[in-house]
Amino acid sequence: FAYAHKLYRELDVPIGILYILAFSSLAVYGVVLGGWASNNKYAFLGGLRASAQMVSYEVALGLSLITVLMLSGNVTLTEIIWQQQQLGMWYAFPLSLAFLLFVISAFAETNRLPFDMPEAESELVTGYHTEYSAMKFSAFMISEFGHMVTASALMATLFLGGWDIPFWTGDN
């Protein structure tokens, strides 16, 4: 933990949260194009269903982030962590409803249980990656797991203090 804040400041973008939201919304195009490019009507329907779910929960995710932006007064990720450090507690406690909304929206946007309707085996076989195997299928899976890691890192940064633990007095 000793050098995490130095590395994070080097990688920080001045428009932090807006940058992350913009790139997470670009994933919708990949899902639709992946379903369409397979030339299968069920994969295309699965891609449309997945993109509709991603777009609809992106709104709830953005609304939960607005509360963090209003409380911190900044869009830079390091400044949000610093504000939590100055407050002496994580934003997950005063913004517990927004934290819960963010967690539910993150599960829905990454197509995890119970929001895995784009991959409903009984209706659409396996969703938008029905016709893919080997390297193309693994590319879809890597992108989905990357989306989960990004959502988890964003949750830890915005609501759980990032690298800082306010009640721990170790070498920080």
PLM ranges: what are they?
Residues 1-172:
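Selective transmembrane helix interface/packing segments
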